Amino acid sequence: MSFQNPSYINAKHRSFLQPKDTQDSQDLRNWVSHSSVDEETAYSSSTLSSSSSKSFPCYDEYDEIKSPDDQKVEYMKTLRTLEEDAFSYTDSVYDFEERSFDEHEPPIPPLHKTGVFSVPLQPTHTVNSNSDDGYENSSKNEYLDFNSEISASPVNEPMTHSQSYTSIDRLNSSSSHYSKDVPLLCGSLTIDCPTPIDLRGMLGPFMQKNPDEASFLRYSAITCQPEDMNNNGLQLRTWSTGRDIQIAVCLTLSDEDLASFAISLSSIMNNLKHLCSRSKSRVWGNESWEKVLVCVVIDGRNTVHQNVLDLLASIGVYQPHIAKGRVNGKRTLSHMYEFTSTINVDEKLNLTTATGDGNVPMQMLLCVKDRRLGTYNSHRWFLNGIASLARPKVCLFVRNGARLGPTSIYHAWKAFDVDSTIGGMCGKTSIDTGKFGFRLLNPFIASQHFDQMIHNNLRLPYDSCMGYISNALNAIYGFRYVALQDSYPNPGPLADYFEQDQYEIPRRGILQSNAFLAQEQLLFWKVITRKDAKWHLQYVPEACATIEAPNSMAGILESKKSEINSSFSLAVYVIVDFFSLWTTRHKFFRFLLLTVQSLVFAIEKLVNFFSMANFFLAFYFVCNATSYSSLNPYGNWARPLFLVFEYILICLIFSQFMLAMGNRPRSCRVLLFISTALFSIIMIYFVFCVFYISLIPLHNSDNSEIVLGNNYFTTLIFSSLLILACYAFVSLICMDPFFIFTCIVQYILLMPTRIYTEQIYALCHLDDASISKDDNQQEFNFDTGITHCSMNDEGYTTISIPKANVLNSVYNSSLKNFSSSNDTSVYHDVQDHCYRKPQSYEDHYQDIRTRYVLVWAVSNLILAIVLIQVFDGMRFINNGYMKYIFWSIVAFTAWKTMGAVTFIATKIISRIANCVKSKLYIFNDP
């Protein structure tokens, strides 16, 4: 009888299939050796039908034996089959379901290492290159390496770039490849491929200590959705080796440049070094790398930079020649590569190895999605697919291009370890200011640095004190995986969060689309509002990361677009979903804090909705007051000067709509620079008018009682000083107040640019969240250069595997291409790979975008016109609306300062308590 589709077998039964040095096998060899039937004839004979139950009880009886020679042939074939099983990978992907073992069934074909025996490298044997499977004695320094198909042969010259990546089909049909039959598991292909010999030589001591892990790269062609990966029996190599994953780090890539990716990958390796150096920890130690899985998810294999793939291939986690576009007629949705490497890349794009560089092994998983579906969908593959297989304790997300601190990953994990009620965390994100702060000379970077520091020192501590982190995107954040999982009968946060994946529902609302682009903020909300749970969030400033801020207005617009849109849409979503807080089990005080935070969050977003009108009204009422004789610093030019600046401001506001709707930022740099310069000049004029109308009347008066009261000074200067005092106070507590002196001027001058240019551009591109992904209902030819495979009647597929010289040639080509790459660019145009939705969908989303922008602009226009008509420009001190705007900002800032101070004080007290506790423990330790 022939083998059917592979069944599942548990690890404890596998040893039964692996022959040892038993008397049966030795007698069989002796018997065959005296026979006229040689081994090659026996091995090349017909497929085994069954075997003798006497010698091998796991086989069925022979149906028919015609001659002694046939017996010898079948016995020889049986012996060869069992020997190959002995060299198979002992932790097969089939080991996920336990069942009873039937000794009368034929042996289960395990997952073979492609083209190489999977026995651990033996120092006393090596492969005879002149025999298919023979052995010969060798020195103790030699290792069992390749089968004859890929045995050591002269290494060819490195292939050209086009040969390595675009001529795979031609290579597969050449004599440099051989065929291999491997089993299919639920329609998905999983194979263990040998790694190049040159790569093994770069792994250093790790190769000798973990030869089996360093000699093979596991490739899986995933044909199912990420939610079905676990049910289909797929297993990660970390699970097969029985490792307990504490942290899974996710790094998503799309069209980012090589330099950004190298910075993040290098910083992750440095964090692994720190974890391995914590020899006194109860969890971490010398083998800490076994508890960390680094996942790189690429959003579309046609959009990623080629030199990024060269880097991944140089590390060893990527091989371009093994990908399969279709498996058994089903389209491959993602290509997954698993490898453990000690090769790292530094920030200067230099490869470092374990020898002499102090690198530690890093377990890497590369998931290359076949289509570009966005970062949101990449997180779905990580959380619903990869994390469900790895089962980590903590899932961390690192923004591409972020340079993590050397202990960031440890402190992120420690926050979850100390407090069991923390469901999510976010770290501290800083702007790279260069050596001695030289980059702060650029006003755009200085303005972003000021805003980011206020975010770190004021907003994040306040949010952490309340329990929900609602602010802008972070460079490092994470979740406790248990808090994300389903708990029957209630679905977990992931079920609701990824239910709105655009791959599943392409016609959802435009605000909902942008809300889900908020990523961690929305998932944070799902965690704290989980039914019958009481998770809260925490800010961990020790988990720090540094990013490079855009140094031009065009770059700022590109980076701020999704942040502004997702922030507003998230506010709408939180307001609508507010009553989900009532289904949680938070304590009353925590529930009260979350309720107050949600209300303040909603009011703040409402004020920001009218920020265009509010700034124009403040400019109009303050500057118009200086054009009259009582407060006139310009003489006869006061009124004309005010009108000139007023008309320039109005024209600039309308011009921003034209620039946003008709151009990309990088194509109109000059116009953006001119508008930014004009906005800054207007801001200088506005600030001068504020100080003049506030201080001149105070200077001319002899009555000191009017310093604070119903006057210009109290409304304008004093309120602004209170806000600045709050900023300085929390920054001083955080031991970082210097940015106020170096960046506040640039921040004030660019304020109208942030209010008008950034907001208008972002909202005019509100529809980008809905049309920049591939359409799941359209078919595109992605299979260029990638082969297919189909399953035969026995549950196997035949694939083409390159020999050793081809592996080395491709690897050396990747090294050469990576070494010669000069990619330091930040911008990369991938419009050729952005497959748009049908025109009807684009029209639908653009229509919604137009309506929303129209409502937003008209609302601000009506508010400005009405208030200008209602209030007299000469009587600003009686303008109740402007007082409300200024003092509401003061109230928001003061409230957040109280929360931030509470958070910082709590952390200080906690540190002191832990220090005292540790001292007492040492003192009382006998």
UniProtKB/Swiss-Prot annotation:
<feature type="region of interest" description="Disordered">
    <location>
        <begin position="1"/>
        <end position="56"/>
    </location>
</feature>
<keyword id="KW-0961">Cell wall biogenesis/degradation</keyword>
<feature type="transmembrane region" description="Helical">
    <location>
        <begin position="721"/>
        <end position="741"/>
    </location>
</feature>
<dbReference type="GO" id="GO:0140278">
    <property type="term" value="P:mitotic division septum assembly"/>
</dbReference>
<keyword id="KW-1133">Transmembrane helix</keyword>
<protein>
    <recommendedName>
        <fullName>Chitin synthase-like protein 2</fullName>
    </recommendedName>
</protein>
<comment type="function">
    <text>Plays a role in septum formation. Has no chitin synthase activity.</text>
</comment>
<dbReference type="Pfam" id="PF01644">
    <property type="entry name" value="Chitin_synth_1"/>
</dbReference>
<dbReference type="GO" id="GO:0016020">
    <property type="term" value="C:membrane"/>
</dbReference>
<dbReference type="GO" id="GO:0071944">
    <property type="term" value="C:cell periphery"/>
</dbReference>
<dbReference type="GO" id="GO:0030428">
    <property type="term" value="C:cell septum"/>
</dbReference>
<feature type="transmembrane region" description="Helical">
    <location>
        <begin position="671"/>
        <end position="691"/>
    </location>
</feature>
<keyword id="KW-0472">Membrane</keyword>
<feature type="transmembrane region" description="Helical">
    <location>
        <begin position="599"/>
        <end position="619"/>
    </location>
</feature>
<dbReference type="Pfam" id="PF08407">
    <property type="entry name" value="Chitin_synth_1N"/>
</dbReference>
<keyword id="KW-0132">Cell division</keyword>
<dbReference type="InterPro" id="IPR013616">
    <property type="entry name" value="Chitin_synth_N"/>
</dbReference>
<feature type="compositionally biased region" description="Low complexity">
    <location>
        <begin position="44"/>
        <end position="55"/>
    </location>
</feature>
<keyword id="KW-0812">Transmembrane</keyword>
<dbReference type="GO" id="GO:0071555">
    <property type="term" value="P:cell wall organization"/>
</dbReference>
<keyword id="KW-0131">Cell cycle</keyword>
<dbReference type="InterPro" id="IPR004834">
    <property type="entry name" value="Chitin_synth_fun"/>
</dbReference>
<dbReference type="InterPro" id="IPR004835">
    <property type="entry name" value="Chitin_synth"/>
</dbReference>
<comment type="similarity">
    <text>Belongs to the chitin synthase family.</text>
</comment>
<feature type="transmembrane region" description="Helical">
    <location>
        <begin position="853"/>
        <end position="873"/>
    </location>
</feature>
<dbReference type="GO" id="GO:0000935">
    <property type="term" value="C:division septum"/>
</dbReference>
<keyword id="KW-0717">Septation</keyword>
<dbReference type="GO" id="GO:0006031">
    <property type="term" value="P:chitin biosynthetic process"/>
</dbReference>
<feature type="transmembrane region" description="Helical">
    <location>
        <begin position="885"/>
        <end position="905"/>
    </location>
</feature>
<dbReference type="GO" id="GO:0004100">
    <property type="term" value="F:chitin synthase activity"/>
</dbReference>
<feature type="transmembrane region" description="Helical">
    <location>
        <begin position="641"/>
        <end position="661"/>
    </location>
</feature>
<dbReference type="GO" id="GO:0032153">
    <property type="term" value="C:cell division site"/>
</dbReference>
<feature type="transmembrane region" description="Helical">
    <location>
        <begin position="564"/>
        <end position="584"/>
    </location>
</feature>
